[in-house]
């Protein structure tokens, strides 16, 4: 039996308010998971992550397996002890990185052989290996090993990729159970932007049985309208009693639109990566701190924001100065702000769903940006 319990508390339209419960803590949903690729969220401490409002983080199986390796992490009793994070952790399977980062890869029915991006050594990774790695990491949510369908892809390519992922899903389930791992195991729906393939993928995953269902292959360059169409197609077909996770997405607008279409969980490197490039998210849009207009700007990133950077009074002019001088403090403060913004956005959406005011929240979200609220299915534009 999985260590995860999921409670769907209420809905507002298709938006869902719920709670994930683990022995290591609870996660209120909809939730955003900061990404700790190498076992840390770049530039900030674990206790700062918690103070920002994050309740779960993501670790990267592919990178942690290659460096420092399982022996070192195993010496610490798993990723929680290694990273000094005592809350829940989700680990991806390594599949996306194999297909996006690995060099000279060869895909067979058994798995993928590739050249390590760290030292060029030949490495094999398949469903059984991924499940074994994630067992050593001792994550609370384990992702199956799958092939991330590229975009664009013909329907035939997407079909063959989806069918391979389904066979790997069955092997992932068997390997996970064979290891006696009580972590939650999530299936990943693939199929590109083809509704019938998405349906077949989900049907196959449900026949195997998983603790939650992720939607993969929708952060690979497809247009926003195609991503939303796939979410709308899947919403009534996904089991209501299981959590839903949209992988690798994305912008604040993407989170709002995902929640509006029934998504419970998100992850993305955007708030941390963009902070390191001087892009700070606010309720009125993005502050690009390298712009010359901020050279003598005495405002904080977003006046009234409760993050450490804004509440301490660091000005845009100061942050621009730090960024231009390549001072470490610039991305640290920017990361604190961006993650605060993302976690506050999720908290505000949870409150709106609970109050039955998500439609009004969504309108005010776009109005603050000077944008028109895009219509949902069934609404007039």
Swiss-Prot record:
It comes from the Bacteria. Its EC number is 2.4.2.29. Substrate binds at residues 92-96, 146, 190, 217. Residues 248-254, 272-276 are annotated as: RNA binding. Keywords: Glycosyltransferase, Metal-binding, Queuosine biosynthesis, Transferase, tRNA processing, Zinc. The keyword Transferase applies. Zn(2+) binds at residues 305, 307, 310, 337. The active site is at residues 92, 267. GO terms for molecular function: metal ion binding; tRNA-guanosine(34) queuine transglycosylase activity. Pathway: tRNA modification; tRNA-queuosine biosynthesis. GO terms for cellular component: cytosol. It catalyses: 7-aminomethyl-7-carbaguanine + guanosine(34) in tRNA = 7-aminomethyl-7-carbaguanosine(34) in tRNA + guanine. GO terms for biological process: queuosine biosynthetic process; tRNA wobble guanine modification; tRNA-guanine transglycosylation. InterPro entries: ArchSynthase1/Queuine_TRR (IPR050076), TGT (IPR004803), TGT-like_sf (IPR036511), tRNA_ribo_trans-like (IPR002616). Catalyzes the base-exchange of a guanine (G) residue with the queuine precursor 7-aminomethyl-7-deazaguanine (PreQ1) at position 34 (anticodon wobble position) in tRNAs with GU(N) anticodons (tRNA-Asp, -Asn, -His and -Tyr). Catalysis occurs through a double-displacement mechanism. The nucleophile active site attacks the C1' of nucleotide 34 to detach the guanine base from the RNA, forming a covalent enzyme-RNA intermediate. The proton acceptor active site deprotonates the incoming PreQ1, allowing a nucleophilic attack on the C1' of the ribose to form the product. NCBIfam families: Q_tRNA_tgt, tgt_general. Belongs to the queuine tRNA-ribosyltransferase family. This is Queuine tRNA-ribosyltransferase. It comes from Xanthomonas campestris pv. campestris (strain B100).
């Amino acid at each position: 039996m999985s260590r995860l319990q999921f409670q769907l508390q209420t809905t507002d339209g298709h938006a869902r308010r719920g709670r994930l419960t683990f022995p290591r803590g609870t996660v209120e949903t909809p939730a955003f998971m900061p990404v700790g690729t190498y076992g840390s969220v770049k530039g900030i401490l674990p206790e700062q992550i918690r103070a920002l409002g994050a309740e779960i983080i993501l670790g990267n199986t592919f990178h942690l397996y290659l460096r420092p390796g399982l022996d070192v992490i195993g010496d610490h009793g798993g990723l929680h002890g290694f990273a000094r994070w005592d809350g829940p952790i989700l680990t991806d399977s390594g599949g996306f990185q194999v297909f996006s980062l690995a060099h000279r890869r060869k895909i067979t029915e058994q798995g993928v052989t590739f050249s390590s991006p760290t030292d060029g050594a030949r490495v094999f990774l398949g469903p059984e290996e991924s499940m074994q790695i994630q067992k050593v990491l001792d994550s609370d949510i384990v992702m199956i090993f799958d092939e991330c369908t590229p975009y664009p892809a013909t329907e035939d390519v997407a079909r063959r990729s989806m069918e391979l992922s389904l066979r790997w899903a069955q092997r992932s389930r068997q390997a996970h159970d064979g290891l006696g791992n009580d972590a939650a195991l999530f299936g990943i729906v693939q199929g590109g932007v083809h509704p019938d393939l998405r349906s077949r993928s989900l049907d196959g995953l449900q026949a195997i049985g998983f603790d939650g269902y992720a939607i993969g292959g929708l952060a690979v360059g497809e247009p926003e309208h195609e991503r939303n169409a796939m979410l709308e197609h899947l919403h009534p077909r996904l089991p209501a009693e299981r959590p839903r996770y949209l992988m690798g997405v994305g912008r604040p607008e993407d989170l709002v639109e995902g929640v509006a279409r029934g998504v419970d969980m998100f992850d993305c490197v955007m708030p941390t990566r963009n902070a390191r490039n001087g892009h700070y998210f606010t309720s009125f849009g993005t502050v690009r701190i390298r712009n010359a207009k901020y050279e003598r700007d005495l405002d904080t990133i977003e006046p009234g924001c409760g993050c450490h950077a804004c509440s301490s009074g660091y000005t845009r002019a100061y942050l621009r100065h730090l960024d231009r001088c390549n001072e470490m403090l610039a991305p640290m403060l920017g990361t604190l702000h961006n993650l605060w913004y993302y976690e506050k956005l999720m908290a505000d959406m949870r409150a709106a769903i609970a109050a039955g005011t998500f439609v009004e929240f969504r309108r005010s979200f776009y109005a603050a940006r000077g944008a028109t609220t895009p219509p949902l299915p069934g609404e007039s534009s």
